[in-house]
Amino acid sequence: NWTELPEGMLGIWDMPLPTYFGEAVVCMLDHLKGQPILPQHLENVREGDIVLLGSKWSGEDQPWIEGDTAFWLAEEKKIKMLGVGVPGISWETNTDAPEPNNSPTHRAMTGNNIPIVYPLDNLQALTQERVFFLSLPLNVESMEGTWVRAIAIEDKA
């Protein structure tokens, strides 16, 4: 829980529609069984990318997003959207920590007006590192989240 929302935080209804689609990088992190996800594991992320994270793991074996990595994605790479495979990636960490150290991934993304899409399924079916990704939310005011139909389109070439 947060006592205050980040200053300048937009709701999903306020964000420009192009925020929810575009070029995405698919980061399958099967090699990180039970380990933190660090910036060096995400070298293929370009500035402005939609980032899709997945792995074959579940439970305690899932890799997790380190708080510093979340802020690196949001503030240095300026990603457009974060998509998380669940199970596969543990992204909501430190939820019981006192503010402002709780939920670092959630804070990094929402504090920088970057939507989080989860739970994504079938990421392991993607065969290309870069795809076109579309995830349009319902246009519902005063909601932090809503249902989406997430679609990844691979290039036929």
Regions found by a protein language model. Give the residues of each.
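Active-/binding-site microenvironments in catalytic and ligand-binding cores
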Residues: 1-157
